[in-house]
């Protein structure tokens, strides 16, 4: 069964859960979030629909769990990438990693390309864990030495996340997101000042 700790991290996941989540991710990548259905996930995972519904009562619950698992992978990667960084360097790393994640992730790429409006809907619902992402960014900045008050740090993390999502979901011709040097330069010039020097 799914277990969430108080901080939103996933608890232990069984082999069946992993198989369902891996398959669900593939189905969401293939059909998009709106067109995907539990029947396809069950058939491809080799389990019954009732097995999925016992673990994930709705498609939104299943999608939320897939996204949360992606978030945990992102933040474990971010923790490694920002080890020994200053808060300013961490902003650059987080932005560059976030852009690369969306480019490399078939799931996020599918959403950005065919269902970008879902990011807006998800940010106002429990499905897309925008709070978890913002908290993770705040945690990373604090670990890297950010010394601003907690409330200010939470606001800064939220702003950084929303700016990054805006650029990723609605690309601009002012930034070539396929050019990592340009992405890092953009973050250093425009996002680092938000955290202060």
What are these regions (language model features)?
Residues 45-56:
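Short hydrophobic/aromatic patch on the recognition helix
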Residues 80, 112-120:
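Short linear capping/connector segments at secondary-structure termini
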Residues 19, 61, 73, 89-97, ...:
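Amphipathic alpha-helical interaction segments
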Residues 1-44, 61-64:
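Basic, helix-initiating cap at the start of DNA-binding domains
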Residues 72-75, 119-147, 151-158:
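Amphipathic alpha-helical packing segments from all-alpha helical-bundle domains
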Residues 20-28, 74, 78, 98:
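Short hydrophobic clusters on alpha-helical segments that form packing/core surfaces
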Residues 143-189:
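Hydrophobic/aromatic-rich alpha-helical bundle segments in the mid-to-C-terminal region
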């Amino acid at each position: 069964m799914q277990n969430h700790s108080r901080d939103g991290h996933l608890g232990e996941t069984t082999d069946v859960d992993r198989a369902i989540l891996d398959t669900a991710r593939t189905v969401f990548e293939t059909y998009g979030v709106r067109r995907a259905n539990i029947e396809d996930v069950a058939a491809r995972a080799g389990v019954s629909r009732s097995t999925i519904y016992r673990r994930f009562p709705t498609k939104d619950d299943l999608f939320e769990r897939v996204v949360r698992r992606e978030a945990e992978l992102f933040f474990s990667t971010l923790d490694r990438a920002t080890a020994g960084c200053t808060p300013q360097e961490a902003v650059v790393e987080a932005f560059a990693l976030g852009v690369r994640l969306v480019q490399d992730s078939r799931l996020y790429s599918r959403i950005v390309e065919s269902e970008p409006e879902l990011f807006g809907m998800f940010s106002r619902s429990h499905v897309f864990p925008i709070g978890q992402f913002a908290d993770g960014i705040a945690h990373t900045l604090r670990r890297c030495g950010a010394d601003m008050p907690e409330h200010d740090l939470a606001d800064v993390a939220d702003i950084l996340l929303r700016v990054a999502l805006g650029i990723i979901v609605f690309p601009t011709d002012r930034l070539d997101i396929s050019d990592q040097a340009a992405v890092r330069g953009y973050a250093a010039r425009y996002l680092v000042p938000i955290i202060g020097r």
